[in-house]
């Protein structure tokens, strides 16, 4: 959420951000309400001062034994007017708040201008896509043939866009989770948390999922609980309504969680395989930083996520996301896209975002600067480190052999206890 003072002072900047991100927000109405609110506050203050004066006059007349009935009647009229104005002010503030919720974060000046993912800008690549001497198969065919992925059983048990990982498939999923966590904890300095998979509405609001993306969330009927779409939600809200000692910053957290998404806008896209599931595993990275360090920390976070793919030997590219594809909460975002041979293209496997103080204002996360001074909002960052199911898919496709087996990446062998995944007899 943006500061109303910033919006008031920079309406053209905010209007441009709304336009660049393709959002709909009634900025003119907000500014009109803000002006009216400030005028009413001045008037209310004057009326309350007048009420205090009249109250003193009534008390004086009573002490002197004089008739105060006329002043008491005026006092009642004044109090009623104040009460009515306070109610109107509350209604104005509620309407302002609802409009504020619809205003997106301001894109950083370094973000490419564009309307869609076609305007995103490639920053760098790592690794060379493998040249196959046979026709590479898609990961779902490989997994089903090996008996390690079962989409048909999941469809019977739950529905479409779910999967059973079986045998060495379950072990590979678990190995990837543990490998990613170990890398981020032991090498990159993140502290692990294991969060709840259910959060309440205020937490979803704090990270910006609500109210805009409610249709994509799974809500538990009859409760205020939502299944988390990403561990970003509980981990960021770990510090909601708190004041952090500036000496503790930056704070790095990593977390494994299952993630749950309706994928409401994804009809017809990636309908087969692991790329777009209603439930999927992910290792998330979350940072809390001082404002002047957040962009440096974004670069480091992106490199941390990249290192997962480098260690696994998976070719990828990093893309700077343009304004129209940036999303509601981010000021700047990088996507990491892994090479998928059967697709013949790179597929998103991680997004790393700097939200500046946008989420911190919504969740009221502040810090006390080193050496004292006025409380400030932290900057929050989040990134996938990385999506586990998509990494599973990328390994099957990039490490597949002509006989249908899959070579296990070397760094995973201590976790897997096998070098090659073959069909179990």
Curated annotation (Swiss-Prot):
User: Could you tell me which pathway this protein works in?
Assistant: Aminoacyl-tRNA biosynthesis; selenocysteinyl-tRNA(Sec) biosynthesis; L-seryl-tRNA(Sec) from L-serine and tRNA(Sec): step 1/1
Q: What GO biological process terms are annotated to this protein in UniProt?
A: selenocysteine biosynthetic process; seryl-tRNA aminoacylation
Q: Does the keyword Iron-sulfur apply?
A: no
Q: Which InterPro entries match?
A: aa-tRNA-synt_IIb, aa-tRNA-synth_II, aa-tRNA-synth_II/BPL/LPL, Ser-tRNA-ligase_type_1, Ser-tRNA-synth_1_N, SerRS_1_N_sf, SerRS_core, tRNA-bd_arm
Q: What Gene Ontology cellular-component terms does the record carry?
A: cytoplasm
* UniProt main location, coarse: cytoplasm
Q: Report residues binding ATP.
A: 261-263, 348-351
* Protein name per its UniProtKB record: Serine--tRNA ligase
Read off the lineage from the record: Bacteria, Bacillati, Bacillota, Clostridia, Thermoanaerobacterales
């Amino acid at each position: 959420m943006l500061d109303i003072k910033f919006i008031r002072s920079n309406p053209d900047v905010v209007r441009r951000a709304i336009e660049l991100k393709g959002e709909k927000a009634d900025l003119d109405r907000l500014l009109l309400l803000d002006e009216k609110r400030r005028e009413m506050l001045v008037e209310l203050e004057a009326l309350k001062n007048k009420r205090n004066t009249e109250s003193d006059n009534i008390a004086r007349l009573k002490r002197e034994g004089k008739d105060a009935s006329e002043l008491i009647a005026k006092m009642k009229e004044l109090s009623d007017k104040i009460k009515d104005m306070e109610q109107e002010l509350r209604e104005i503030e509620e309407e302002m708040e609802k409009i504020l919720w619809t205003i997106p974060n301001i894109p950083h000046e370094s973000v490419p201008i564009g309307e869609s993912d076609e305007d995103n800008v490639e920053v760098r690549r790592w690794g060379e896509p493998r040249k196959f001497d046979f026709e590479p198969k898609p990961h779902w065919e490989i997994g089903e043939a090996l008996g390690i992925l079962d989409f048909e059983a999941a469809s019977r048990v739950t529905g479409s866009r779910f999967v059973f990982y079986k045998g060495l498939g379950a072990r590979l999923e678990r190995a990837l989770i543990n490998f990613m966590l170990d890398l981020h904890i032991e090498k990159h300095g993140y502290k692990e948390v294991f969060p709840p998979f259910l959060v309440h509405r205020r937490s979803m609001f704090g990270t910006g999922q609500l109210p805009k993306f409610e249709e994509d969330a799974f809500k538990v009927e009859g409760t205020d609980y939502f299944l988390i779409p990403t561990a970003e939600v509980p981990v960021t809200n770990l510090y909601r309504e708190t004041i952090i000692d500036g000496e503790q910053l930056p704070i790095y957290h990593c977390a494994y969680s299952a993630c749950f998404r309706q994928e409401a806008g994804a009809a017809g896209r990636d309908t087969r395989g692991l790329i777009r599931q209603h439930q999927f595993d992910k290792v998330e990275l979350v940072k809390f930083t001082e404002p002047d360090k957040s962009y440096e920390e974004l670069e480091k976070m992106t490199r941390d996520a990249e290192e997962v793919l480098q260690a696994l030997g998976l070719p990828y590219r990093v893309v700077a996301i343009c304004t129209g594809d940036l999303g509601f909460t981010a000021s700047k975002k990088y996507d990491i896209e892994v090479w998928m041979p059967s697709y013949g293209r790179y597929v998103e496997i991680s997004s790393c975002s700097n939200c500046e103080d946008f989420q911190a204002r919504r969740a009221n996360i502040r810090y006390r600067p080193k050496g004292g001074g006025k409380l400030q909002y932290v900057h929050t960052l989040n990134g996938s480190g990385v999506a586990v199911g998509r990494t599973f898919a990328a390994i099957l496709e990039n490490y597949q052999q002509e006989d249908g087996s899959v070579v296990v990446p070397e760094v995973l062998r201590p976790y897997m206890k096998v070098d090659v995944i073959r069909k179990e007899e």
